[in-house]
């Protein structure tokens, strides 16, 4: 039995979960999210208001999907109640970010500003010219947008310049030694 998969998913008040076969829809104060669970996994509502995720057999695929499916359902519930936020920061002389309407515009040392459009369900907030955050109810989408932004200018291992997650430790390299 999966250590994560066997834990029941608690559904807080104000959250409505509907299950239709393999489709799970979660409605909460922040919005609605839907997910299709992979075939061997079965999800059911319990009498005490929790959700149980079970697998029919001990095949390798079923074991692999058991804990994953439970965590994905938990992420839906957390998303519609609390939401997800990734805080990011920019290091480097002249590197900055600005909010243009709902979108972000970066100055990252290129000959042109780099715009990033806010997809549906994602909001950007700029705290200072070097600190910003990506927020939304879908954990996967927030993480993917954050990774795409980081990819614009990855942190340099020699000077540490670039876009990074808040608190991320960059492995620094020693430069060439002079004569």
Curated annotation (Swiss-Prot):
Membrane-traversing stretches: none
Keyword field = Ribonucleoprotein, Ribosomal protein, RNA-binding, rRNA-binding
Query: Which NCBIfam families does UniProt cross-reference here?
Result: L6_bact
Give the originating organism.
Rhodococcus opacus (strain B4)
What protein am I looking at? Large ribosomal subunit protein uL6
What family does the database annotate?
Belongs to the universal ribosomal protein uL6 family.
Quaternary structure, per UniProt, is: Part of the 50S ribosomal subunit.
What's its job?
This protein binds to the 23S rRNA, and is important in its secondary structure. It is located near the subunit interface in the base of the L7/L12 stalk, and near the tRNA binding site of the peptidyltransferase center.
Q: Which InterPro entries match?
A: Ribosomal_uL6-like, Ribosomal_uL6-like_a/b-dom_sf, Ribosomal_uL6_a/b-dom, Ribosomal_uL6_bac-type, Ribosomal_uL6_CS
What GO biological process term is on the record, naming one? cytoplasmic translation
Q: Which Pfam families match?
A: Ribosomal_L6
